[in-house]
């Protein structure tokens, strides 16, 4: 490990690895570090991604594909089922990944592009001089190193310390985080061609339960519950998950379990400062509705890698330059989608089970493989006129997209 690089990327998840690869492909000298000894472990998500969007960032490799989904089924509190084609099911439906293999493959691609990759290497603080981030203090195999870099990219996940060290407020309130629990189960009779989502305040308060098949009778079964609905004297997310498992898959065997948190806060005020950018969960760039963050992280990582090249080439890594080449571009694209999702989240967390059932009944007969904006408007108007009004900004935005696509 050298003491000077162009770019230091802290965290080797999808965001960090894509950022490192992108910067290295541009000819920059890059160090990518991961605090754990094994990249991709532990897994902390349902592992589902949209096929078309994934192909934008990486060539598909069957080694890290567990299942190929064609649809999703959403179940209302009363059991009403809504079927949606894969293309309309959002960023988390399409392929089910083996994240332990996938994340490692992304890091390998970064290494092949020229980045240096170091595991069991933890950042313990930033080097800050004259109000500029100049690198980080690292701990590797019991030895401390001061590593300098022209730009530091913080990709250290939901528990990020990098942003806080740099003076960026990444704090989360209980309502801004989903508390999650997930089991990998085996021995269950699970359809391997679609995933399932279960909603309802008795099932997962202000959240949902997911079932993602992983082949050979295995599946990820997990739950996310809004942090404001957990705490002292309240059931834990794992309690809701255990109850669901007992009812839905009584013969299943739990072979692995993971716990964690997912940011659902929407965009934070600031994701860059002099000499530093935040990406992925560290920048709170996950989807506020689903908590899904793989594709958003890869998108942000690519933008950050390109921004690092632009800033270093210009000899200017100031906040003003990083706002120009990273902050403004990501907010105009990815950030816009996150903001729209936050509007939906804030509407739906206030719906009662009766409201959710009414909405499901209105959507039950809709053919989602060819649904139009007008179809959705009519269904929402029938179910809940107030909900339609609350979401009006989304439809105004969607209508603009329809017009743009037709011209």
UniProtKB/Swiss-Prot annotation:
Q: Its Gene Ontology biological processes?
A: glycerophospholipid biosynthetic process; membrane lipid biosynthetic process
What are the record keywords, sorted? FAD, Flavoprotein, Lipid biosynthesis, Lipid metabolism, Oxidoreductase, Phospholipid biosynthesis, Phospholipid metabolism
Amino acids binding FAD: 15, 34, 45-46, 48, 99, 123, 281, 293-294
The name this protein goes by in its record: Digeranylgeranylglycerophospholipid reductase
Q: What pathway does this protein act in?
A: Membrane lipid metabolism; glycerophospholipid metabolism
Q: What does this protein do?
A: Is involved in the reduction of 2,3-digeranylgeranylglycerophospholipids (unsaturated archaeols) into 2,3-diphytanylglycerophospholipids (saturated archaeols) in the biosynthesis of archaeal membrane lipids. Catalyzes the formation of archaetidic acid (2,3-di-O-phytanyl-sn-glyceryl phosphate) from 2,3-di-O-geranylgeranylglyceryl phosphate (DGGGP) via the hydrogenation of each double bond of the isoprenoid chains.
Q: Which reaction does it catalyse?
A: a 2,3-bis-O-phytanyl-sn-glycerol 1-phospholipid + 8 oxidized 2[4Fe-4S]-[ferredoxin] = a 2,3-bis-O-(geranylgeranyl)-sn-glycerol 1-phospholipid + 8 reduced 2[4Fe-4S]-[ferredoxin] + 16 H(+); 2,3-bis-O-(phytanyl)-sn-glycerol 1-phosphate + 8 oxidized 2[4Fe-4S]-[ferredoxin] = 2,3-bis-O-(geranylgeranyl)-sn-glycerol 1-phosphate + 8 reduced 2[4Fe-4S]-[ferredoxin] + 16 H(+); a 2,3-bis-O-phytanyl-sn-glycerol 1-phospholipid + 8 A = a 2,3-bis-O-(geranylgeranyl)-sn-glycerol 1-phospholipid + 8 AH2; CDP-2,3-bis-O-(geranylgeranyl)-sn-glycerol + 8 AH2 = CDP-2,3-bis-O-(phytanyl)-sn-glycerol + 8 A
Q: Which Pfam families match?
A: FAD_binding_3 (PF01494), GGR_cat (PF22578)
Additional comments on file? Reduction reaction proceeds via syn addition of hydrogen for double bonds.
- Family membership noted in the UniProt record: Belongs to the geranylgeranyl reductase family. DGGGPL reductase subfamily.
Its source organism is Methanosarcina barkeri (strain Fusaro / DSM 804)
Q: What is its EC number?
A: 1.3.7.11
> What are the protein's GO molecular function terms?
FAD binding; geranylgeranyl reductase activity; oxidoreductase activity, acting on the CH-CH group of donors, iron-sulfur protein as acceptor; oxidoreductase activity, acting on the CH-CH group of donors, NAD or NADP as acceptor
Cofactor(s), names only, from the UniProt record: FAD
Cofactor binding summary note: Binds 1 FAD per subunit.
For whether the record's keyword set contains Lipid biosynthesis, the answer is: yes
Broad EC category:
oxidoreductase
Keyword presence, Cytoplasm: no
Q: Which domain of life is it from?
A: Archaea
- Transmembrane stretches in the record are none
Listed InterPro entries: DGGGPL_reductase (IPR023590), FAD-bd (IPR002938), FAD/NAD-bd_sf (IPR036188), Geranylgeranyl_Rdtase_fam (IPR011777), Geranylgeranyl_reductase (IPR050407), GGR_cat (IPR054715)
Looking up NCBIfam families in the UniProt record yields: GG-red-SF (TIGR02032)
What's a GO cellular component annotated to this UniProt protein?
Answer: membrane
């Amino acid at each position: 490990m050298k003491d000077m690089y162009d770019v230091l990327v802290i965290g080797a998840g999808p965001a960090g690895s894509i950022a490192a690869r992108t910067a290295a492909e541009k000819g920059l000298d890059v160090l990518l570090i991961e605090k754990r000894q094994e990249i991709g472990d532990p897994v902390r998500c349902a592992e589902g991604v949209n096929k078309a969007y994934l192909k934008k960032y990486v060539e598909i490799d069957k080694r890290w594909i567990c299942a190929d989904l064609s649809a999703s089924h959403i179940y209302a509190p009363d059991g009403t089922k809504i079927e949606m084609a894969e293309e309309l099911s959002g960023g988390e439906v399409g392929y089910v990944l083996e994240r332990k293999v996938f994340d490692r493959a992304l890091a390998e691609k970064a290494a092949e592009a020229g980045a240096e990759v170091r595991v069991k290497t933890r950042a313990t603080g930033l080097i800050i001089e004259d109000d500029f981030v100049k690198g980080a203090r690292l701990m590797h195999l019991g030895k401390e190193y001061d590593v300098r870099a022209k730009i530091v990219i913080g990709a250290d996940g939901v528990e990020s310390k990098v942003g806080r060290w740099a003076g960026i407020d990444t704090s989360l309130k209980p309502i801004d985080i989903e508390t999650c629990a997930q089991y990998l189960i085996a021995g269950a009779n699970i359809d391997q061609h679609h995933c399932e989502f279960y909603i309802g305040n008795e099932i997962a308060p202000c959240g949902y339960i997911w079932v993602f098949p992983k082949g050979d009778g295995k599946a990820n079964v997990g739950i996310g519950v809004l942090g404001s609905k957990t705490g002292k004297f309240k059931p834990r997310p794992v309690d809701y998950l255990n109850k669901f498992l007992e009812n839905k898959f009584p013969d299943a065997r739990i072979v692995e379990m993971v716990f964690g948190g997912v940011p659902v806060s929407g965009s934070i005020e600031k994701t860059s400062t002099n000499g530093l950018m935040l990406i992925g969960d560290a920048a709170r760039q996950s989807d506020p509705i689903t908590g899904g963050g793989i594709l958003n992280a890869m998108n942000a990582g690519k933008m950050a890698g390109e921004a690092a090249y632009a800033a270093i080439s210009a000899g200017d890594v100031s906040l003003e330059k990083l706002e120009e080449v990273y902050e403004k571009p990501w907010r105009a694209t990815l950030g816009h989608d996150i903001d729209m999702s936050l509007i939906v989240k804030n509407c739906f967390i206030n719906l009662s089970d009766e409201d959710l059932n009414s909405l499901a009944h209105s959507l039950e007969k809709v053919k989602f493989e060819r649904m139009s904006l007008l179809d959705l408007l009519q269904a929402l108007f029938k179910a809940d006129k107030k909900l339609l009004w609350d979401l009006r900004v989304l439809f105004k935005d969607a209508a603009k997209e329809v017009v743009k696509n037709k011209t």
